[in-house]
A protein has these predicted regions:
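Hydrophobic/aromatic beta-strand elements that line small-molecule binding cavities or substrate pockets
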Residues: 109-110, 132-139
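Short beta-strand segments that buttress and anchor functional surface loops
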Residues: 120-127
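Short hydrophobic/glycine-rich mini-motifs in sensory/regulatory modules
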Residues: 140-146
């Protein structure tokens, strides 16, 4: 019986299809020549030089920073604070929590910059969530901005790990360089 098995393996036709493991294309993150600045009307942030701004509608501060190398978009939504700061924060937290259904967990990092009056939270949503990173920031008086990452690919956390690592750095850069127009001496 063992001899028959060895003979069968040696003379088996090679044209038999073998399933191949699922593969994912390699993502090449381009070098950042020098930071570019999104100068949306109510705020400005530094971002990777490969990203381009696409305004949405006519409301200032609404649009997407598009990252073509990974089919990623960071959707920015700016809203003026008009006595509704707690409602804006609640909405931002609710939108982040909605992704918890498909997530393996969520962590939050608080960001405070008193000199620029920037106070915010970065949400890291683990697993195969549609939006793995989100943030909001405010000056607690006049300005509120929210950002959410969307990558237009199947949300597989293993294959997207390098992209999520890149965007975690981008979101940190947004929070560290965010300035409100008219509040910090910028024109």
């Amino acid at each position: 019986m063992a001899v028959a098995a060895v003979v069968a393996v040696l003379f088996w036709p090679e044209s038999v299809a073998m399933p191949k493991p699922k593969g994912y294309p390699r993502v090449q993150i381009p070098a950042d020549k020098s930071p570019s600045y999104l100068d949306a009307q109510p705020f400005t942030v530094a971002h990777h030089s490969s990203a381009q701004w696409e305004a949405k509608g006519t409301q200032p501060g609404w649009g997407d920073l598009v990252y073509p190398f990974c089919r990623g978009r960071v959707q920015f939504t700016y809203l003026p604070v008009r006595g509704n700061l707690s409602a804006l924060i609640d909405d931002a937290q609710d939108l982040a929590l909605r992704h918890n259904v498909a997530a393996d967990g969520m962590s939050q990092r608080v960001y405070v910059n008193d000199s620029l009056k920037v106070y915010g939270i970065l949400f890291r949503i683990g697993g195969n969530a549609a939006s793995g990173l989100q943030f909001y920031a405010t000056d607690s008086a006049r300005h509120f901005v929210r950002g959410a990452l969307y990558i237009y690919a199947h949300p597989n956390s293993d294959s997207l790990a390098p992209v999520h690592e890149f965007f975690e750095g981008e979101f940190t850069r947004y929070l560290e360089t965010l300035e409100w127009r008219g509040a910090s001496g910028r024109p």
